[in-house]
Amino acid sequence: MADQRQRSLSTSGESLYHVLGLDKNATSDDIKKSYRKLALKYHPDKNPDNPEAADKFKEINNAHAILTDATKRNIYDKYGSLGLYVAEQFGEENVNTYFVLSSWWAKALFVFCGLLTCCYCCCCLCCCFNCCCGKCKPKAPEGEETEFYVSPEDLEAQLQSDEREATDTPIVIQPASATETTQLTADSHPSYHTDGFN
């Protein structure tokens, strides 16, 4: 059993139908009927001395589980067992994306764009370094202010000078100290609402 060659992944999507003895356009009722008939025939309880029957029963169960699930059956019909493997690895919603990106024309497009942009150096320079470290940066349209960088030290100095100019009169009275009994406003009266949430 260990010397046996591993089964290769098919792309035709027909072998599960052959396991159940059906053709590719079988309905879900046909699949159920064929599964019941073959499951009774190859069930391990009915064939206790036949290990091939147990293996055949496992294949029948696998075929039934895949062909009765509408999403898995659709993937199997389009891409075969390779599609089921991809769905298991990357998720059922990503199967089409995987096969599109692994097609010859997607790979050729990727290589062509790489050659056109000097191994994507142009994209890296434009996106990461703002076109030659800002030297080739696109000009802002007329009438719009250009954004520029202000260092935190310059910003702090500007804020301090604005505060000095805005406060002409110094504050000469210290605020009163607060304690636990100090109220936030002078005209409010304390209420503890102990009489039924008024």
From Swiss-Prot:
Changing residue 10 to A/E: Increased syntaxin binding. The modification Phosphotyrosine is found at residue 17. Ser-10 phosphorylation induces an order-to-disorder transition triggering the interaction with Lys-58. This conformational switch modulates DNAJC5's cellular functions by reducing binding to syntaxin and synaptogamin without altering HSC70 interactions. Residues 13-82 form the J domain. The keyword Ribonucleoprotein does not apply. It is found in: Cytoplasm, Cytosol; Membrane; Cytoplasmic vesicle, Secretory vesicle, Chromaffin granule membrane; Melanosome. InterPro entries: DnaJ_C_subfamily_member5 (IPR051434), DnaJ_domain (IPR001623), DnaJ_domain_CS (IPR018253), J_dom_sf (IPR036869). Expressed in pancreas, kidney, skeletal muscle, liver, lung, placenta, brain and heart. It is a lipid-anchor. The modification N6-acetyllysine is found at residue 56. The modification Phosphoserine is found at residues 8, 10, 12, 15, 151. GO terms for molecular function: ATP-dependent protein binding. Keywords: Acetylation, Cell membrane, Chaperone, Cytoplasm, Cytoplasmic vesicle, Disease variant, Lipoprotein, Membrane, Neurodegeneration, Neuronal ceroid lipofuscinosis, Palmitate, Phosphoprotein. GO terms for biological process: chaperone-mediated protein folding; exocytosis; negative regulation of neuron apoptotic process; neuron apoptotic process; regulated exocytosis; regulation of synaptic vesicle cycle; synaptic vesicle exocytosis. Upon phosphorylation, Ser-10 interacts with Lys-58, a highly conserved residue in DnaJ proteins that is also a ubiquitination site in DNAJC5. Acts as a general chaperone in regulated exocytosis. Acts as a co-chaperone for the SNARE protein SNAP-25. Involved in the calcium-mediated control of a late stage of exocytosis. May have an important role in presynaptic function. May be involved in calcium-dependent neurotransmitter release at nerve endings. It is linked to Ceroid lipofuscinosis, neuronal, 4B (Kufs type), autosomal dominant: An adult-onset neuronal ceroid lipofuscinosis. Neuronal ceroid lipofuscinoses are progressive neurodegenerative, lysosomal storage diseases characterized by intracellular accumulation of autofluorescent liposomal material, and clinically by seizures, dementia, visual loss, and/or cerebral atrophy. CLN4B has no visual involvement and is characterized by seizures and other neurologic symptoms. PANTHER family: DNAJ HOMOLOG SUBFAMILY C MEMBER 5, DNAJ HOMOLOG SUBFAMILY C MEMBER 5 HOMOLOG. This is DnaJ homolog subfamily C member 5. It comes from Homo sapiens (Human). The gene is DNAJC5.
